[in-house]
Structures are given as C-alpha cells and as structure tokens.
Amino acid sequence: ELFMGDLKRYSIKPLMIDDYSEITDILKEINRRLNHNNVFVSGSAYEYSEYSEDEKAATDFIQSLSQRLIQKGFNIISGFGLGVGSAVIYGALQEIYMKNQRINDERLLLRPFPQGEDYKAMWKEYREDMISRAGVSIFIFGNKYDAENESTVLAGGMKQEFEMATEQHNLIVPVGCTGYMAHKIWEEIHEDLSKYYTNVDDELTVAFKKLNNKCETSQLIDNILSFIDLFKNGKHTSAN
C-alpha cells in the first residue's frame, strides 16, 4: 500500500486484481475504450434495389451517414467497398473540409483491398486489421456481381467482417433496411439480441427494430446514431 501511495503522487493510479486472468479482461476494456469512437463501415453494392431503385438516393444516404458520423466526433474506417467506399469518403471529406480540419488517419482511415487472385489470401488480414481498430461496426447493403452466373449475390466478405467484428466485441449495427447481407445480419441478431448486446430491454429492442425500417434518409441516420448512443452511458454494451 505504501508503494501504491508513492505511485499516486506521480499521477499513476494502481489497479488491484484478485486473479492473473483479470489482466486479459482489463486489457480488453482498455482497447474497447480506446476504439469506441472508431467506426468501421462495412459495405459493398453492385446494386441498391432492395433499398431504393434510385441509385442516387442510395449513395446520398451513404454520404450523409458518413458526414453525420464525422460531425458526431466519430472516426471512420473503410475498406473502400464497391459502390460504397467512394460515397463514404466523399461524405467524410465534405465534413472535414467544412470544419477546416486536416485529413489524417485518425479521422478517416482507408484500407483499399488489393485486387487480383494472388492478393485474395491477404484480404482476411486486411479485414482483421481494420476491425481491430474499431469499436463500432456498421453494416450496409452487402452484395456483389457474380460474373460466372451473371447475377447479383450476397457478399460473403461482409459475413466474414460481421464474424470478426463479433469476435472483437465491436458494437454491431446492421442497417437491415439497406437489404442484402446487411439484412441477413439484422435478421440473425434479431433472433437473439442478448447474444450480441447486454441488458436488452424494450428501449434497445425498439431501437434495433428501427434499423430495419425504411424511411427518409435523415430519419434513418437518426435511427442509426440513436442506436449507437444507447451504448455510450454503459447501460448497454456489446456482449462478450
């Protein structure tokens, strides 16, 4: 205790533990708090029809979401997904420039995926790196074009990112109304909210359901941000 008192004089706050295994939990909590303002936006879209037949309406939603996240003080991480990445970047830069801020990796971190068959083995590492830097993962759309069958299919990469984000204890925010894989993820979580979130109550349940409601762009973004806000005061957290 005398040694602990000496540490406090140097503004070092010691933490007592009962068991060595608690160190892992403490480190996880430190990492969560460090990353809680970092948002990973997972999305790809060859088409947007399950959300809107108007492509511009879809890209406007993505841009506005990105802009509002920056406004709220969040930092954005993006893998530059097809049909989504450019809109994410545009929305973020628009807000950063409006506030005369400098662009850096803290506010906007981009990790474009290397293309070509030889690079596909690296994609898993790319995903893990991005998600490890985030505290929140938002899932939108999630489809791609299958040239072999000449059709639009669900994006398996988004499913992998969902699984990784869950393992990393990210706050999972599936915007189900955008359709495709994002809707599949919303459905999976909706079946058992307590598997992904703690202290599930009526407020959280209603907020989660709103992520699947089609509405005006501004209202949808409000629904997304309101859901995230529920986890800010510590009442709710992502489930371990």
Where are these regions (language model features)?
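Alpha-helix C-cap/termination motif
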Residues: 10, 32-33, 133, 168
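Short, hydrophobic/glycine-enriched beta-strand segments
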Residues: 35-46
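Acidic/glycine-enriched connector segments
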Residues: 1, 47-238
